[in-house]
């Protein structure tokens, strides 16, 4: 879906960077509305059940979407609605999925577990993206989205059989107390210096870093490097290879000291690599671009698990869902970043805009290291 959706948008809109950015913004915007509520659900209900229900909803939405696509009834406004509803469903999945990890592994292995989770995502990125590129190149977009439906069906089955110990939670007190829980989660997250710092870092990454795969990469593939749908699929796979290497390396080393400084360093490296990638594309060298993409994947897989592990370890068991829900507000910045990336790429060109966004990541890391000592003290 990561490969097929941007290509479908470009196909429906005649290559519009603006619509691509807005679609990706629509996909992540529901996290703004539902993120904190989803965190409350993750703390008040069985997290496995929350994950199961969201996956069933996404499965149904995906099946309806494929039916519209196969029958040639899909139009652009329907695509906006689908991406919003899917984003709303996944907004409830993420806090529960992230908060459930400490219930499965000991505290000293949380970083390893988050890194291995990221590694599994990279394996699917490698296989799924390459497969999507081949399916689209030799088949159709409909076939790619049809494959997604089967994958979600498998996810529903595996989640059903997931054996997770119940977590400490308060009894559900009714809809009236949701606002109280909402305010409590905001006060706790913002009152904790470490959590507040991680959220600010997450906002910077969401605005400047997340737009690469959602907006810039498909534009580079089709409009700059000229490698088309199949090439874009392989680009995502190559990034997955780098991501897998980074995730497995982090899980093997499992740093227990200076994790805050490491997190900021990996974000700075990711920003510098974004600038380098855009610079390499001026040479029109696909090989060099793909080499940089490998390192981009590694940088992302080193930064993101550390950020999540620090966050989840900084919250008590009964608050973890709500804290992860607060982090979901960073997805609002992903929506903003995606929209800005599409608009700016349409006006300034994709290469210059990517350089600007890469510098944004780099500046975020440097400023937080310089001005926010609480993150440097995280071990």
Which positions does each model-derived feature cover?
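Helix-breaking motifs and short loop linkers at transmembrane-helix boundaries and internal kinks
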Residues: 14, 46, 68-73, 279-283
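Helix-loop junctions on the cytosolic side of multi-pass membrane transporters
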Residues: 99, 103, 145, 149-176, ...
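Juxtamembrane intracellular "pre-TM" segments in multi-pass secondary transporters
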Residues: 165-200
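Substrate-agnostic recognition of the 12-TM MFS/MFS-like secondary transporter fold
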Residues: 1-3, 24-40, 46-61, 78-137, ...
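Residue-level signal for alpha-helical transmembrane segments in multi-pass membrane proteins
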Residues: 8, 64-68, 131, 135, ...
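Residue-level signature of transmembrane alpha-helical entry/exit and packing/kink sites
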Residues: 19, 75-79, 194, 198, ...
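C-terminal transmembrane bundle of multi-pass solute transporters/carriers
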Residues: 32-33, 44, 50, 54, ...
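Helix-loop boundary and gating motifs at the non-cytosolic
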Residues: 1-29, 187-239
